């Protein structure tokens, strides 16, 4: 994000990291990636009854270059997976991903060749939100959990190492379609 990449590891004090995290968690700009019925609940969260604006997220961004949170709401097909990855790569650092619903988290009831069995095989996921579809209150709770994670995320070199490790673990995981046992 600029200065923090140029600082050597361990240079910042923890209080400075906490303060930067506190400021970051209040200015999260989500990019919508609504693919199925979970997107309806995500839109309801932005309405007046649930008021996501109190967390500083009233404007959902249409451009990934203006967003730092991707909410993947719904199932991801094999043809949509490269598009999802491209949108993720275009987002500015630091960036976070929230998998909304069981379809985004694990493929849901669509356990076939055409659906990615969990969006974490394409991009690293920070928060998993269960439900089919999850209620807006659950999305708000997941956003609060993400705020806590953002506040305690390291800066600089430590952040880059953590992101690389999460991406390698996600891409090295066995796809659910190849697993045996209760899933098949």
Curated annotation (Swiss-Prot):
Annotated PROSITE patterns: COMPLEX1_20K
Cofactor: [4Fe-4S] cluster
Pfam families: Oxidored_q6 (PF01058)
Enzyme Commission designation: 7.1.1.-
One Gene Ontology term from the biological process aspect of the record: aerobic respiration
MF annotations from Gene Ontology: 4 iron, 4 sulfur cluster binding; iron ion binding; NADH dehydrogenase (ubiquinone) activity; NADH:ubiquinone reductase (non-electrogenic) activity; quinone binding
Cofactor: how bound: Binds 1 [4Fe-4S] cluster.
Annotated transmembrane regions: none
Bilayer disposition of the protein: Peripheral membrane protein
GO annotations of cellular component type: plasma membrane; respiratory chain complex I
Record key words, sorted: 4Fe-4S, Cell membrane, Iron, Iron-sulfur, Membrane, Metal-binding, NAD, Quinone, Translocase, Transport
Cellular location(s): Cell membrane
Chief location: membrane
Subunit structure: NDH-1 is composed of 14 different subunits. Subunits NuoB, C, D, E, F, and G constitute the peripheral sector of the complex.
Family listed: Belongs to the complex I 20 kDa subunit family.
Function, as annotated: NDH-1 shuttles electrons from NADH, via FMN and iron-sulfur (Fe-S) centers, to quinones in the respiratory chain. The immediate electron acceptor for the enzyme in this species is believed to be a menaquinone. Couples the redox reaction to proton translocation (for every two electrons transferred, four hydrogen ions are translocated across the cytoplasmic membrane), and thus conserves the redox energy in a proton gradient.
Name used for this protein in its record: NADH-quinone oxidoreductase subunit B
Source species of the chain: Nocardia farcinica (strain IFM 10152)
Gene name in the database record: nuoB
């Amino acid at each position: 994000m600029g200065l923090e990449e140029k600082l050597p590891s361990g240079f910042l004090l923890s209080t400075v990291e906490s303060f930067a995290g506190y400021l970051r968690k209040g200015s999260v700009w989500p990019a919508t990636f609504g693919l199925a019925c979970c997107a309806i609940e995500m839109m309801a969260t932005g309405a007046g009854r649930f008021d996501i604006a109190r967390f500083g997220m009233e404007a959902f961004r249409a451009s990934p270059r203006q967003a730092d949170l991707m909410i993947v709401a719904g199932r991801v097909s094999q043809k949509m997976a490269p598009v999802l990855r491209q949108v993720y790569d275009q987002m500015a650092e630091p960036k976070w991903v929230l998998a909304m619903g069981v379809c985004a988290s694990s493929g849901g009831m669509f356990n076939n060749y055409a659906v990615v069995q969990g969006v974490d095989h394409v991009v690293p996921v920070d928060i998993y939100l269960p439900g089919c579809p999850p209620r807006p209150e659950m999305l708000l709770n997941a956003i609060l959990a993400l705020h806590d994670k953002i506040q305690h995320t390291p800066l600089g070199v430590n952040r880059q190492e953590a992101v690389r490790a999460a991406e390698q673990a996600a891409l090295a995981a066995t796809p659910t379609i190849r697993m045996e046992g209760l899933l098949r």
